[in-house]
Amino acid sequence: MSNTPIELKGSSFTLSVVHLHEAEPEVIRQALEDKIAQAPAFLKHAPVVINVSGLESPVNWPELHKIVTSTGLRIIGVSGCKDTSLKVEIDRMGLPLLTEGKEKAVRPAPVEPATPSEPPQNANPITKTRLIDVPVRSGQRIYAPQCDLIVTSHVSAGAELIADGNIHVYGMMRGRALAGASGDREAQIFCTHLTAELVSIAGVYWLSDKIPAEFYGKAARLRLADNALTVQPLN
């Protein structure tokens, strides 16, 4: 048992980000309800981050917040906000303002002359891929942050694979596969036996009934083209 009453630890969570391109509350409500109806088990009462970087017209944040939460989604933060007055409104409602990794600005440090030095011999290599060579069972969730995920065995229904990069499954894929989880729209999904409950790339998803019949159970490659999922044979 720990000697301290609390303990702070770093962790990673995969969240859906709702990018708003329209400030009209009723338009947003209808669009969200349509999305939730497509995948209620996946989106009902889901925690989400609202990205407002695409909004140009004035935003009635209290009304917008009310509309989003009325659909059952739970807002845990707001990203992409550059408007000072909107930041004040968001903060007043107790929501954190988040900075997404790709938007984070870093001020370069002054460059000072330095003598060349040998690279450290014990430096840890950057992880490019997470490899899973055992079956992924129902209820299990595998996450590969900032890298690709390769599974060389079967993935059961009810299991979930999440990667910030690509996902490769060299076995029966019956669960859910979410590639490009941090927003990488170049990510892809590769399956030797595509029978997934859900496939998603950068938040754009298909449920199993949306997978074209000619690719179901076959070797397939999925990627985004013109903001829509596409599938082709895996040769």
UniProtKB/Swiss-Prot annotation:
It comes from the Bacteria. Residues 104-125 are annotated as: Disordered. Transmembrane segments: none annotated. Residues 110-119 have a biased composition (Pro residues). GO terms for biological process: cell morphogenesis; division septum assembly; regulation of cell division; regulation of cell septum assembly. InterPro entries: CAP/MinC_C (IPR016098), MinC (IPR013033), MinC_C_sf (IPR036145), MinC_N (IPR007874), Septum_form_inhib_MinC_C (IPR005526). Keywords: Cell cycle, Cell division, Septation. HAMAP family: MinC. Cell division inhibitor that blocks the formation of polar Z ring septums. Rapidly oscillates between the poles of the cell to destabilize FtsZ filaments that have formed before they mature into polar Z rings. Prevents FtsZ polymerization. Belongs to the MinC family. Interacts with MinD and FtsZ. This is Probable septum site-determining protein MinC. The gene is minC.
